[in-house]
Amino acid sequence: MILQFPLWWYAAPAILKGWIERVYAFGFAYGYKNGANEYRFGDGILKGKRALVNVLTGGPAADYGPRGINGPIDQLLFPLTHGALFYPGMDVLPVHAVHGAAHITTAEEVEAVKSAWRVRLEGLFTDAPIPFRSQNGGDFPDRHTMADHVSPEKTGLVAHLVDETAA
């Protein structure tokens, strides 16, 4: 699944959220297999499917960097990537962003955006997904709270990412 949208007030537009709320009905995206919370965050009905978010921003890339004024784009979109896409089991690819979209005016800039998108799509089925911690992978023994021994130095959103350097 590819979701493409402009970033509006630091999130997806309301119409996209409305679509998710209507399509992700009980028994499908949540409440899967008799409604228990056993099959979620990596193990839902969409396990094995891939998802990619292509977002267009008004500001430059620097605004969405690790120390940018708007905050990292990956963290801004965490409710979508981790919540709406990973929750029902999808392998979520790193976000593709077109920054300063409204200011792309020359043919060269347009071609650069198109070229970057082509390259991104070439890896749609081979690129590594975001290494979110799965609910049933051992890091959440009660399915709700991360075990104390798992990345004790991390809190917040980054704690939900597997530290690949430790593996």
Residue ranges and their predicted role:
Residues M1-T81:
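Helix-loop-strand module that forms the ligand-binding subsite of alpha/beta enzymes
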Residues D63, R67-A167:
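Glycine-rich phosphate/pyrophosphate-binding loop and the adjoining helix
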